[in-house]
Amino acid sequence: MHCPFCSAHDTKVIDSRLVAEGDQVRRRRECQACGERFTTFETAELVMPRVIKQDGSRQPFDEDKLRAGMQRALEKRPVSVERLEAAIGRIKHELRATGEREVKSRVLGELVMAELRKLDEVAYIRFASVYRRFQDLNEFREEIERLSREPSKP
C-alpha cells in the first residue's frame, strides 16, 4: 500500500485488529520511507449475483425491491423490522452461498417464500398468491391446505 503522505510504496503493518463485529480489519501502518503512520480499514467485497428474470433478461440484485415486496406481504402483520431485516440477511447469505454469478428469479422467489413462511403464514399466503399467480379461490385453498399439512422449517 502506498503512503498517503509521501506516496512511497514500502509500508509496514504494525498492528491489525478486528472491528465492526468482525466484519472489518483495522490496520495501523508505518511508511518505511518517511516514518509516518496511518490507519487503513479492510472489508470483504460481497458481490450479489445478477437475477435472471423469466423473460431471460438479467438485472442486478436489488435489495430495496426485495424489501419492498416482503414489506407489502407483511403489511399490517405483527412482524418487527428486526425480524424482516434478519430474513433479508438470510436470503442474501443464501444467494451468495450459491457461489453463482447469476441466479434465476424463481430461486429468489422460493427463498422469499420460505422466509415469509417462517415469519408469518398470512404474509406467506399473500406473497404466494401474487408470486404463483393464483387465479381463483381453489388455488388459495390448496395452498392453505398444503401449508397446514407441511410443518414450517425453522
UniProtKB/Swiss-Prot annotation:
Keywords noted in UniProt: ATP-binding, DNA-binding, Metal-binding, Nucleotide-binding, Repressor, Transcription, Transcription regulation, Zinc, Zinc-finger
Cofactor requirement: Zn(2+)
Top-rank taxon, per record: Bacteria
Zinc fingers (unnamed) by residue: 3-34
Pfam families: ATP-cone, Zn_ribbon_NrdR
Single GO BP term: negative regulation of DNA-templated transcription
Ranges where the ATP-cone domain occurs: 49-139
Molecular function via GO: ATP binding; DNA binding; zinc ion binding
Record text on cofactor binding: Binds 1 zinc ion.
UniProt function note: Negatively regulates transcription of bacterial ribonucleotide reductase nrd genes and operons by binding to NrdR-boxes.
NCBIfam families per record: transcriptional regulator NrdR
Recorded family membership: Belongs to the NrdR family.
Name of the molecule in the record: Transcriptional repressor NrdR
Organism in which the protein naturally occurs: Azotobacter vinelandii (strain DJ / ATCC BAA-1303)
Gene, per the UniProt record: nrdR
